């Protein structure tokens, strides 16, 4: 099958920069449908719902595609699956599904980190042959804690946390989803890389979609605004890159590496 020139350009840009704005955006009705489901799940008491430390504010939701029909259809939209397969060069499955919610005035920051550090050290993923696709469910602005990436930083490989040498690691999964992350990139290293490559804030209206590399260094600030910032993230992993013995809960790391079969149309 031939690859179109625009897709080749996209693959080159993704390989160079580690992130890519997607031409596919969710329609307003689909965004509203997802918001409704996410808000409903947020009110449930279940392990997939993570709260901010010392607060009743919801920080994140995990694995919603395993128990919610709307989220299950979302991960099978042809535009998303097709892009993931083209970027990764083969069949993919859903490795992670999460919704990061920064509540107005309460949403805490995510420090500089790389997703692949968690997946490699905790789950045994062999290579960063995966892709994150972020979908904005709210308008994301400079004020409500947007995702910030260091373009090209994925080429540095895994940047170990040298700021705390000898620190005993915790394998409690809660330390992988809180504001006090287990694997972080020290500010001085992130600052040095940012000085070389720059920093890009990923903002846009609700429905915007962005792809980014598992090894790209990224962070986000506190939400000090009066507007919530909700971003849904789907991680597609190449089937041949499936970790052999993941130990974290299934709602964090899928055990089902069956290739995703797209639905018939790009709508929910």
UniProtKB/Swiss-Prot annotation:
Entry's cofactor comment: Binds 1 Fe(2+) ion.
S-S bonds: none
Pathway: Antibiotic biosynthesis
A molecular function (GO) term: iron ion binding
UniProt keyword Metal-binding, yes or no: yes
Enzyme Commission designation: 1.14.11.57
Entry superkingdom: Bacteria
Enzyme class, spelled out: oxidoreductase
Catalytic reaction equation(s): L-proline + 2-oxoglutarate + O2 = trans-4-hydroxy-L-proline + succinate + CO2
Function in brief: Involved in the biosynthesis of the peptidolactone antibiotic etamycin (viridogrisein).
Subunit structure: Monomer.
Similarity remark: Belongs to the PhyH family.
PANTHER family listed in its UniProt record: ECTOINE DIOXYGENASE, PHYTANOYL-COA DIOXYGENASE DOMAIN CONTAINING 1
Protein name, UniProt field: L-proline trans-4-hydroxylase
């Amino acid at each position: 099958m031939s690859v179109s020139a625009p897709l080749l350009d996209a693959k080159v840009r993704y390989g160079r920069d580690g992130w890519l704005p997607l031409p596919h955006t969710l329609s307003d009705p689909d965004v509203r449908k997802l918001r409704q489901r996410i808000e409903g799940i947020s009110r449930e008491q279940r392990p997939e719902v993570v709260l901010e430390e010392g607060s009743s504010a919801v920080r994140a939701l995990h694995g919603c595609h395993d128990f919610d029909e709307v989220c299950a259809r979302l991960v099978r939209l042809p535009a998303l699956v097709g892009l993931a397969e083209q970027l990764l060069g083969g069949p993919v499955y859903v490795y992670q599904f999460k919704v990061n919610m920064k509540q107005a005035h309460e949403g805490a920051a995510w420090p500089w980190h790389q997703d692949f550090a968690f997946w490699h050290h905790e789950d045994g993923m062999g290579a960063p042959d995966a892709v994150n696709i972020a979908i904005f469910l709210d308008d994301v602005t400079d004020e409500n804690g947007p995702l910030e990436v260091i373009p090209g930083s994925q080429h540095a490989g895994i940047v170990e946390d040298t700021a705390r040498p000898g620190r005993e690691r915790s394998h409690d999964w809660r330390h992988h989803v809180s504001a006090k992350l287990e694997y972080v990139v020290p500010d001085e290293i992130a600052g040095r890389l940012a000085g070389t490559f720059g920093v890009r804030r990923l903002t846009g209206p609700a429905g915007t979609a962005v792809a980014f590399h598992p090894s790209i260094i990224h962070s986000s600030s506190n939400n000090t605004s009066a507007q919530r910032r909700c971003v849904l993230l789907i991680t597609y992993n190449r089937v041949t890159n499936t970790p052999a013995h993941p130990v974290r809960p299934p709602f964090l790391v899928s055990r089902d590496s069956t290739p995703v079969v797209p639905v018939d149309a790009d709508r929910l």
